[in-house]
Curated annotation (Swiss-Prot):
Keyword annotations: Endoplasmic reticulum, Ion transport, Iron, Iron transport, Membrane, Metal-binding, Nitrogen fixation, Nodulation, Transmembrane, Transmembrane helix, Transport, Vacuole
Gene: VTL1b
GO molecular function annotation: iron ion transmembrane transporter activity; manganese ion transmembrane transporter activity; metal ion binding
Protein name: VIT-like transporter 1b
One GO term of the biological process aspect: nodulation
Subcellular location as annotated: Endoplasmic reticulum membrane; Vacuole membrane
Ranges that cross the membrane: 55-75, 83-103, 145-165, 172-192, 205-225
Family of this protein: Belongs to the CCC1 family.
Source organism per UniProt: Glycine max (Soybean)
Induction of expression: No significant changes in expression observed in response to short- or long-term iron deficiency in nodules.
Membrane topology, as annotated: Multi-pass membrane protein
Tissue specificity of this protein: Highly expressed in the fixation zone of the root nodule. No or low-level expression in root, leaf and stem.
Organism taxonomic ancestry: Eukaryota, Viridiplantae, Streptophyta, Embryophyta, Tracheophyta
Role this protein plays: Iron transporter that is involved in accumulation of Fe(2+) ions in the fixation zone of the root nodules. Exhibits low-level iron transport activity.
Length: 229
């Protein structure tokens, strides 16, 4: 076995071969801390303001338009009737979601801003703190666009699914299957952006969509059978 020489030279074994030295790996603590700080610096409460509108819009667009198309298909099996009803639901729903979200978030913004001003007036340096705190308030325009755009994306899923299927039964099966897949995807994306459990979110989306579609199809089928025949 090789022994270290007193002058610190590279040790040799008994046959004269140089023993390799194992380099020490140094962890860059500054880089690790910077990565950790970047991850923890994400304001998930700020993200939740537009994420809530986007998740609500996507789920509402998908479920409402799918349910509307299935309801129309329950009494009229024509593909054109289902597509026209779905497109009308997309336009009306996107506009309604955008206006409703804008009014709701504007009201929330005004209430929170008024409360914030009252609290700042009671403390010193309130004007300076007010400008900083206003950045945490919800943005009405951001929520409006997120809601309208996500509603349209969700509503396009059943429309595109039914557009290329001629047979009624096959069309309904394809629409339900694609809507179910989209519900799982929306639930997973929402959970990923909000850092919440994915399984719980996907199950919640899926069950809610199935219940809405079942109720709409069943009641419309019952009404059509009793009133139109």
């Amino acid at each position: 076995m090789a022994n270290a020489t007193p002058n610190g030279s590279v040790p040799h074994n008994h046959v004269g071969a140089v023993l390799p030295t194992i380099p020490t790996i140094k962890i860059d603590e500054k880089q690790t801390l910077a990565t950790s700080e970047d991850h923890t610096s994400i304001d998930y409460l700020q993200r939740a303001q537009w994420l809530r509108a986007a998740v609500l819009g996507a789920n509402d667009g998908l479920v409402s338009v799918t349910s509307l198309m299935m309801g129309v298909g329950a009494v009229k099996k024509d593909a054109k009737a289902m597509l026209v009803a779905g497109f009308a639901g997309l336009v009306a729903g996107a506009c309604g979601m955008a206006i409703g979200e804008f009014v709701a978030v504007c009201t929330q913004y005004e209430v929170e801003l008024g409360q914030m001003k009252r609290e700042m007036n009671m403390s010193e340096g309130g004007e300076r703190d007010l400008e900083t705190e206003k950045r945490t308030l919800p943005n009405p325009l951001q929520a409006t666009w997120a809601s309208a755009l996500s509603f349209s994306i969700g509503a396009l899923v059943p429309l595109l699914s039914a557009a290329f299927v001629a047979d009624y039964r096959t069309r309904v099966i394809v629409v339900v299957a694609m809507a179910s897949l989209a519900l799982v995807v929306f639930g997973s994306v929402g959970a990923q952006l909000g850092k919440t459990p994915k399984l719980k979110s996907c199950v919640r989306f899926l069950l809610g969509g199935w219940i809405a579609m079942s109720i709409t199809f069943g009641l419309t089928k019952l009404m059509g059978a009793s009133a139109l025949e």
